[in-house]
Amino acid sequence: MIAIVDYGVGNIKNVERAVNHLGYDAQLTSDFDTIKESSHIILPGVGHFKDAMTALKASGLDKLLIELQDKKPMIGICLGMQLMFEHSDEGDVEGLGMIPGRVVSIDTPYPVPHLGWNNLESKHPLLDKDVYFIHSYYVQTPAPIIATAEYGLPITAIVQKDNKIGIQFHPEKSGDFGLAILDQALKGGFIHD
């Protein structure tokens, strides 16, 4: 069973539908035992970084996720990806610290938020099409960046560190291509030894 962490932030039902559509057993949950027993953890989210961290801390889910970070594959989607990092300039708040790096404001001549379809740029053969973004902040990280999207500057679109994968765009809203990316992430990601 794949645990989709329900911490009261964002449109997470679409993520559950997408994972189930791929043939996996996904469950929205905030129950500690269910999360501990899961095979994978997905941390979704849309909204403000500070509000999300406040919700995770209030429930104790932040400590649980940190405890499990090396024991289970984890996928962060959109705000969920950003929460996996050390710090965000959005609200000047510490994140979960699972992946080195920080979340910074998109400083570009283009409209912010970065909203709509944008092409991925990557050396990985799967990652060559448009995906759906909606965000005003992006990640700067020394961790392996799997794909970027150009938006006046290179936006980190997919990052992977060990068993942790961050996806800035919404694979659940990116059609069959987005589902294929989500499936690949659930199968272990994009870096293989």
What kind of region is each of these model predictions?
Residues 1, 26-37:
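Short acidic low-complexity segments
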Residues 126-129, 160-165:
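Beta-strand-turn-beta hairpins that frame and shape the catalytic cleft
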Residues 86-153:
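Pocket-forming structural segment of enzyme catalytic cores
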Residues 153-160:
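Short, surface-exposed beta-strand/loop micro-motifs that present aromatic residues
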Residues 169-193:
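Acyltransferase
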